[in-house]
């Protein structure tokens, strides 16, 4: 039986969530309907589930969600990961910090040349800094929990997050493109 570890992006990233419907909560209902008919197991770490519940009001369907999706954390204290992963992470983080500083310096020079601080200059700094620092990098405990749980369960990680997919790939975790989840569920259900 296939196992899938879900990230919030399945339900919150507009490009992924639309596969289950236009309305976010109806989309979760559609996912649950498909999950019940699919010969697979679905998991979500507690930290990711808590984050998801802060993003979406699941009050009326929380019990249904927890019926179809196992909510559990990885066994962090008994798992090991290769030291090379940590070395690569530190190397990448150092490079990103340097890029972020260069962007901040560039915008500071532009601001110094301006007679007043334009709001679009601040917005540009914020966007470029975020891109340099976060895009393609695991940047939260929730992200790490999902990757570790997929590794522990030998499950497929379902996420649109580039950083999670990149780390999962480095660690040998099976990956499923989040945009394809509904079709994969339907394919599995049709064969059952």
UniProtKB/Swiss-Prot annotation:
Q: Which UniProt keywords apply?
A: Endonuclease, Hydrolase, Nuclease, tRNA processing
Q: What is this enzyme's EC?
A: 3.1.26.5
Q: Does the keyword tRNA processing apply?
A: yes
One of the record's GO molecular function terms: ribonuclease P activity
Q: Disulfide connectivity? A: none
Record's catalysed reaction(s): Endonucleolytic cleavage of RNA, removing 5'-extranucleotides from tRNA precursor
**GO aspect biological process, one term:** tRNA 5'-leader removal
Record-linked NCBIfam families: PRK04358.1-5 (NF003344), RNA_lig_partner (TIGR03875)
Annotated family: Belongs to the HARP family.
Q: What does this protein do?
A: RNA-free RNase P that catalyzes the removal of the 5'-leader sequence from pre-tRNA to produce the mature 5'-terminus.
User: Mind telling me what this protein is named?
Assistant: RNA-free ribonuclease P
Q: Which organism is it from?
A: Alkalilimnicola ehrlichii (strain ATCC BAA-1101 / DSM 17681 / MLHE-1)
Q: What is the lineage of its organism?
A: Bacteria, Pseudomonadati, Pseudomonadota, Gammaproteobacteria, Chromatiales
């Amino acid at each position: 039986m296939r196992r899938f570890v879900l990230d919030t992006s399945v339900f919150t990233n507009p490009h992924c969530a639309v596969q289950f419907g236009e309305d976010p909560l109806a989309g979760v209902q559609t996912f649950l309907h498909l999950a019940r008919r699919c010969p697979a197991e679905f998991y979500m770490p507690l930290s990711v589930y808590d984050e998801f519940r802060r993003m979406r009001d699941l009050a009326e369907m929380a019990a249904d969600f927890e019926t179809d999706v196992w909510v559990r954390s990885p066994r962090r204290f008994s798992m090991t990961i290769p030291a090379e992963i940590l070395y690569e992470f530190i190397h990448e983080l150092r490079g990103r910090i340097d890029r972020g500083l260069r962007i901040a310096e560039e915008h500071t020079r532009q601001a110094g040349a301006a007679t007043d601080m334009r709001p679009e200059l601040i917005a540009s700094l914020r966007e470029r800094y975020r891109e340099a620092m976060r895009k393609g990098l695991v940047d939260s405990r929730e992200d790490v929990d999902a990757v570790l749980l997929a590794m522990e369960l030998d499950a497929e990680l379902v996420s649109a997050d580039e950083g999670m997919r990149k780390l999962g790939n480095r660690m040998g975790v099976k990956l499923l493109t989040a945009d394809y989840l509904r079709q994969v569920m339907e394919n599995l259900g049709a064969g059952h």
